[in-house]
């Protein structure tokens, strides 16, 4: 005879509901603390998940900022979140309290894909020994293989010439520039990680770029947040591997490429690229179970550097070309400065920047206006801290609304317009603003910032030295409103290229 009857089901349901409500209250008790940031009222069990606008989170956060101020709180299921808006709040958290806010929140979706505590890569790694070890290694290795040296500048310049040749083949017909930009930028980071470049029609490069685009789509939206906030759902067999199939495929493909390079490694010779250098560290660390130099992390660090090194720079260059066809007067001024300083025959060099204030200002304004990582990468407090007078307890996820800094009406004269004069003084000299932080700030500032700056200047000036860009005849003017996933990318558009 069954134990659950009509007479027992009702009381049991009530008991379960009361228990869950008590658990929910226990998780939310921090909201009652003095000086905890205000925020919208959460719904039991799911918090503010159902209220979030995952398609336009920047607009949603702007509305909440208007209601609650520059520091407000959310509850994503049982995950406490504090959103920081405006220069003062973001700078205080990331720079002045960087030791308290340098951690990353746990990401159960990645743990479920088989990544262990010593194999978290770089960008989502928890703040601690393993992260310090890998950041130190990556910075020193990138320097050893050319970052800050003439050799890397030559790699970028040579790749820019290949890119210009590919653009020249498109002359006379409309085309979308994103695919070619992805390939060119990928080859720069590939030279550092794999010691080689790919031909633009190489099947493996095309596969890697396609998987990267899929991964970016999978890595945003409601489902990702729901699975991270309610990780018990990840125990549904096969769910994580299916929902995040592109990430798994990238790991597999990266591992294949790593193994191919390891077969040609001569241990008696200096390392040829980052993979060789990492393998040397694995050999040195043998017998140490706590080291972050292991086979799994080799794959994670390599894929982290490749994806981050490619995506952000290529998207920024796509924004640059879009804004040039929308603002032909700015394009002409950049070309005039290139002609006066470099000429049309000599290749651009990084040393030219000091004599090209308008071009440098345009590149900075592209980054500000494009605002490609509007919400940054999430941080987490590693101990109780304060921001703008609010108490933020240990273990709170922090979202740094970088868009609110790059578009702050108190800082920028025309925050929602493309206006290179933001970075020029009255005499036409370049000036940099403290509110310019597209690479974030503090201890977790993007380690690839110097490389990105080099690529942006050299690719952009090479392209505008060789070509003029325009909206294709008969096509409507493209929109300069971006499309948000995890990143903010231009809506699909085409342009025409004309050799100068």
Swiss-Prot record:
Q: What GO cellular component is one of the record's annotations?
A: intracellular membrane-bounded organelle
Enzyme Commission number(s) of this protein: 1.14.14.1
Give the main location.
Answer: endoplasmic reticulum
Where, in this chain's numbering, is heme bound? 446
Topology versus the membrane: Peripheral membrane protein
| Tissues expressed in | Liver. Also detected in several other tissues.
Domain of life (superkingdom): Eukaryota
- UniProt cofactor(s): heme
**Uppermost EC category:** oxidoreductase
Q: Which UniProt keywords apply?
A: Endoplasmic reticulum, Heme, Iron, Membrane, Metal-binding, Microsome, Monooxygenase, Oxidoreductase
Question: Example GO molecular function term?
Answer: heme binding
A Pfam family it matches? p450
Q: Which GO terms describe its biological process?
A: arachidonate metabolic process; xenobiotic metabolic process
InterPro entries per the UniProt record, alphabetical: Cyt_P450, Cyt_P450_CS, Cyt_P450_E_grp-I, Cyt_P450_E_grp-I_CYP2D-like, Cyt_P450_sf, Cytochrome_P450_fam2
Q: Which reaction does it catalyse?
A: an organic molecule + reduced [NADPH--hemoprotein reductase] + O2 = an alcohol + oxidized [NADPH--hemoprotein reductase] + H2O + H(+)
Q: Where in the cell is it found?
A: Endoplasmic reticulum membrane; Microsome membrane
Q: Tell me, what does this protein do in biology?
A: High activity for the hydroxylation of bunitrolol and imipramine; low activity on debrisoquine.
What family does this chain come from, according to its entry? Answer: Belongs to the cytochrome P450 family.
Q: What is this protein called?
A: Cytochrome P450 2D15
Give the species this sequence originates from.
Canis lupus familiaris (Dog)
The gene it comes from is: CYP2D15
